[in-house]
């Protein structure tokens, strides 16, 4: 919890980070692995890094502009994300898996003035056609690309942030490249409301962050940790999850069902002590989770929670502490959130609700009505106020990794082949499949 901080009075993220720096000056706020060595970062060092990178942004005449961020989940990516917020600019985190064509489309859609990237993304970033300033997080040999590593060695710039709660600071894209991307607008106010108040309703000391930053969970969880005085353990890639659990020893982790299943395979065979883990709380979200996984977790004495949210609400919405009596329910509205039903569709409302979709008034007016976000999910509620998902209003497939896939888009691409007459794309046992009727030669 963020005791002593009245988050409702915070105007912007410079105010927020300045307060957090003073509170956590000599506290470990971030941990990550460098090879097999655990690196621990104190608050004074983390926020000094944020100040330095924010100075580079201002000296490059980018303050207040839309700045893209692309790369692997890392300490450097977190510092740059926070630096963009600190200056009152707009952070637009994009997937590192985009093609050059897709990246150009998003650069144009989000009206980016600059793109900050880790060095592994340099090749694709150099293919951006628009007049965008490029900043490499590390060193670069490209003459017209700024090096954040070199520029931050220069004197700091005195930063003034005059933005207010209603000013935009983040554009997030819904779903992956396989669904129609909508650019979600978050303001100082919605991002503060989505991270400072209690999220999980349980006590914990450190949380593991592995999600890509272009997923809302990827950048919200670190801000939750920083704002609530927890240690943020940063992992890069789900494939190394067991190393992170063993060496960084977080006591809280948020997972999608596919990862929870992997965790449960270990927990069925070993105790946490044998594994070297320290988990007290597991939160599962992103897609419907098989109830038998909950039972495995709870048998090990770990608190199990199921969460339901969206990019539009910064992941907040409905949450449930799983017990033997409510395995099928997604729970009740979380702290500060409200839920309702309209013609069977689940609606959400709360202070972390986004300000709409960027440059898309038609979709905004369809999705947000009288302050309520229409999720597109169908649900039921019982007499105790517990919600249960029953289906999708829109025909989307939600994979076990949380990604939304539009079957119609896949069908439209495959049907172009002259050998195919009809196609039906569907989900079965966690995989996407298709029923195809060939166009036989006459």
For every predicted segment, state its role.
Residues 251-255, 263-326, 338, 421:
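Gly/Ser/Thr-rich phosphate-binding loop
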Residues 39, 56-98, 210:
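Conserved AMP-binding/adenylate-forming
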Residues 17-42:
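AMP-dependent adenylate-forming
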């Amino acid at each position: 919890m963020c005791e002593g901080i009245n988050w409702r009075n915070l105007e912007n993220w410079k105010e927020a980070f300045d307060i957090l720096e003073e509170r956590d000056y000599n506290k470990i706020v971030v941990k990550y692995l460098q090879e097999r060595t655990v690196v621990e970062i104190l608050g004074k060092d983390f926020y000094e890094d944020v100040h330095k990178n924010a100075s580079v942004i201002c000296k490059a005449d980018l303050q207040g502009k839309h700045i893209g961020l692309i790369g692997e989940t890392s300490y450097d990516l977190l510092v740059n994300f926070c630096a963009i917020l600190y200056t009152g600019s707009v952070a637009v985190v994009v997937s590192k898996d985009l093609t050059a064509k897709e990246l150009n489309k998003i650069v144009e859609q989000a009206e980016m003035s600059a793109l900050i990237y880790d060095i592994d993304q340099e090749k694709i970033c150099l293919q951006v056609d628009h007049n965008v300033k490029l900043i490499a997080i590390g060193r670069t040999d490209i003459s017209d690309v700024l090096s954040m590593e070199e520029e931050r060695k220069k004197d700091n710039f005195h930063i003034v942030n005059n933005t207010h709660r209603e000013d935009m600071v983040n554009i997030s894209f819904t779903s992956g490249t396989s669904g129609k991307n909508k650019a979600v607008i978050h303001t100082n106010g919605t991002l503060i409301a989505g991270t400072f108040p209690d999220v999980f309703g349980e006590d914990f000391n450190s949380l593991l962050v592995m999600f890509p930053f272009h997923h809302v969970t990827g950048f919200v969880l670190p801000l939750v940790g920083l704002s609530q005085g927890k240690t943020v353990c940063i992992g890069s890639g789900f494939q190394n999850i067991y190393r992170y659990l063993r060496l960084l020893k977080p006591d809280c982790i948020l997972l999608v069902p596919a990862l929870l299943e992997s965790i449960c395979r270990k927990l069925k065979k070993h105790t946490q002590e044998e594994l070297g883990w320290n988990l007290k709380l597991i939160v599962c979200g992103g897609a419907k989770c098989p109830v038998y996984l909950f039972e495995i977790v709870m048998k090990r004495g770990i608190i199990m929670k199921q969460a339901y949210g969206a990019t539009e609400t910064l992941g907040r919405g409905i949450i449930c502490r799983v017990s033997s009596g409510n395995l099928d329910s997604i729970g009740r509205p979380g702290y500060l959130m409200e839920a309702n039903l309209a013609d069977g569709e689940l609606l959400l409302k709360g202070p972390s609700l986004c300000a709409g979709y960027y440059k898309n008034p038609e979709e905004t007016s369809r999705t947000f009505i009288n302050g309520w976000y229409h999720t597109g999910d169908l649900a039921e509620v019982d007499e105790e106020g517990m919600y249960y998902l029953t289906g999708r209003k829109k025909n989307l497939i939600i994979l076990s990794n949380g990604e939304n896939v539009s079957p119609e888009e896949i069908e439209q691409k495959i049907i172009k082949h002259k050998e195919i007459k009809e196609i039906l794309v569907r989900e079965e046992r966690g995989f996407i499949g298709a029923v195809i009727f060939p166009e036989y030669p006459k």
